[in-house]
Each structure stands twice: as structure tokens, then as C-alpha cells.
């Protein structure tokens, strides 16, 4: 386990900021991805790539939900 992982797992003043920062970055990336999913360029991709990007969006949303719950639980 890396030092960074330990910081997030071990209760302290910094873990909350780490999780909040991760959630902010993730949310920004998710917004950009969702915009792309409805763009004309998205439909120029192969069916496989479109499906993978949709799956990625779902996974990112689930991850954001988990981070939010972690922040709410403490």
C-alpha cells in the first residue's frame, strides 16, 4: 500500500481534503465526458468505443457516488 493510500484510509484532517479534491477532479472529467457523449464526434466512433465510453461514464458516476458517501459518513 502506498503512502497516498494510507493517507486516505487513516482518519485525520487530510483525508477529507484528499477525497474532496479527487471528487472535484472526477466531477470535472465526468462533465466533459458526458458532453462528449452527446456530441457529433461521439457518433463518429466505432460501436465498441461508444459502448466503452458509456461504461466509463457509468463507472465514473458510481465512483463519484462512493466518494460523496465517504464524505457524508464522517
Predicted regions and their residues:
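Extended, charge-rich alpha-helical interface modules
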Residues: 2-74
